Amino acid sequence: MKHLLDVNVLLAAIWQQHPDFPKADAWLAGRQVATCPLSELGFLRVSTAPKALNADMAASRQLLQAFLAKHKAEFIPADLPALKSSARKSDGVTDLYLAELASSKGMKLATFDTHIKHAAVQVIK
């Protein structure tokens, strides 16, 4: 089964100083993974945000590119209409969109978030 990685998984898997790096790194071993525009852009946004990691944009792009190459990650388009999302509250809009996108591609959404209620979600523990 292939997994679409959400932003939190990308952050934990790429930044070695992230507290969940060991967990993400171990979970990724031998798995088929995918990203999409939302997860990649979210990774770059959080990585470079002054109140988050405050990393350099070029370095963040380079690390993301190296991660994608190492894991032979598939890039899938975010091709579901946003207005058809099943989200009912603002805090679930992106999470549910990613779960529905993963499901539409026959994948699971890999995340650390336990609050996403969708059949396509696989929580990394």
Segment roles from a protein language model:
Residues 24-31, 102, 115-118:
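Alpha-helix C-terminal capping segments
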Residues 6, 36, 91-92, 113, ...:
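Histidine- and aromatic-rich ligand-binding microenvironments
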Residues 119-125:
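Active-site regions of enzymes building and remodeling cell-envelope glycoconjugates
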Residues 12-14, 46, 119:
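Residues that scaffold the ATP/ADP-binding catalytic core of kinase and kinase-like folds
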Residues 70-114:
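Active-site neighborhoods of divalent-metal-dependent phosphate/nucleic-acid chemistry enzymes
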